[in-house]
């Protein structure tokens, strides 16, 4: 098995010792992605829809850096801080996955930085 870190151009420095993504053979794992700017500040405070879009754009960038894309996503792990934001998160999520939907789960949690409303981790496959 071969593996490599996926670090898109212009990525900020993570808050902890991890890579934004890892590719192992044809499987791509995207780390839990929060609505942070490159300086690890929470963006779009109080707006779950905008935070979700920001997170999914970061994930899209990691996948594209690995030669994959959103259509190749097979599983998403969604963490939200308040079930009241579930509808807003799903509305944006549906825009990024218009065809067959990836498997997923969604749980309510406390996130690592105040103001972050959503975090998503992703598994995708790279097309041969």
UniProtKB/Swiss-Prot annotation:
One of its GO terms (molecular function) is deaminase activity. One of its GO terms (biological process) is uracil catabolic process. It is an enzyme of class 3 (hydrolase). It catalyses: (Z)-3-aminoacrylate + H2O + H(+) = 3-oxopropanoate + NH4(+). The keyword Hydrolase applies. Its EC number is 3.5.-.-. It holds the Pfam family Ribonuc_L-PSP. It comes from the Bacteria. Keywords: Hydrolase. InterPro entries: RutC, RutC-like_sf, YjgF/YER057c/UK114. One of its GO terms (cellular component) is cytosol. The keyword tRNA processing does not apply. Involved in pyrimidine catabolism. Catalyzes the deamination of 3-aminoacrylate to malonic semialdehyde, a reaction that can also occur spontaneously. RutC may facilitate the reaction and modulate the metabolic fitness, rather than catalyzing essential functions. PANTHER family: 2-IMINOBUTANOATE/2-IMINOPROPANOATE DEAMINASE RIDA, PROTEIN HMF1-RELATED. Belongs to the RutC family. HAMAP family: RutC. This is 3-aminoacrylate deaminase RutC. It comes from Azorhizobium caulinodans (strain ATCC 43989 / DSM 5975 / JCM 20966 / LMG 6465 / NBRC 14845 / NCIMB 13405 / ORS 571). The gene is rutC.
């Amino acid at each position: 098995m071969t593996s490599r870190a996926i670090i898109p151009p212009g990525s900020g420095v993570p808050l902890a010792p991890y890579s934004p993504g890892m590719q192992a053979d044809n499987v791509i794992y995207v780390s839990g992605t929060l609505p942070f700017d490159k300086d690890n500040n929470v963006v779009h405070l109080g707006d779950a829809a905008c935070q979700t879009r920001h997170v999914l754009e970061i994930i899209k960038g990691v996948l594209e850096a690995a030669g994959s894309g959103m259509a190749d996503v097979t599983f998403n792990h969604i963490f939200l801080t308040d079930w009241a934001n579930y509808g807003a998160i799903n509305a944006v999520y549906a825009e990024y996955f218009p065809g067959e939907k990836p498997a997923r789960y969604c749980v309510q949690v406390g996130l690592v930085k105040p103001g972050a409303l959503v975090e998503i981790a992703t598994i995708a496959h790279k097309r041969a």
